[in-house]
Amino acid sequence: MTPIEYIDRALALVVDRLARYPGYEVLLSAEKQLQYIRSVLLDRSLDRSALHRLTLGSIAVKEFDETDPELSRALKDAYYVGIRTGRGLKVDLP
């Protein structure tokens, strides 16, 4: 999978969960962060400074690790993509 595919997968899962739980602040925050990462991946000229302030990893662990492991894994992968992109490093997920 490519980095953008990891983001799209996580975004699809978040949108699905938001359909079930509209207005859930944690999911809305995750959606916003995923959309930002996606924008940065598609347009390299965008400001990347906010990539250093992502909270997707902690959201994944604190909110979904036990209750929704699929979403948790997708958010952790997306967080990894965002952090590596912010540091200008290669994203090497399986």
UniProtKB/Swiss-Prot annotation:
**What Pfam families does the record point to?**
Tsi6 (PF18660)
Q: What happens when the gene is disrupted?
A: Deletion mutant cells show Tse6-dependent intoxication with a dramatic increase in division time.
Its BP terms in the Gene Ontology are: protein secretion by the type VI secretion system
Molecular function terms, GO-annotated: toxin sequestering activity
Role of this protein: Immunity protein that plays a role in preventing early activation of toxin Tse6.
Q: What is this protein called?
A: Immune protein Tsi6
In which organism is this protein found? Answer: Pseudomonas aeruginosa (strain ATCC 15692 / DSM 22644 / CIP 104116 / JCM 14847 / LMG 12228 / 1C / PRS 101 / PAO1)
Q: Which gene encodes it?
A: tsi6
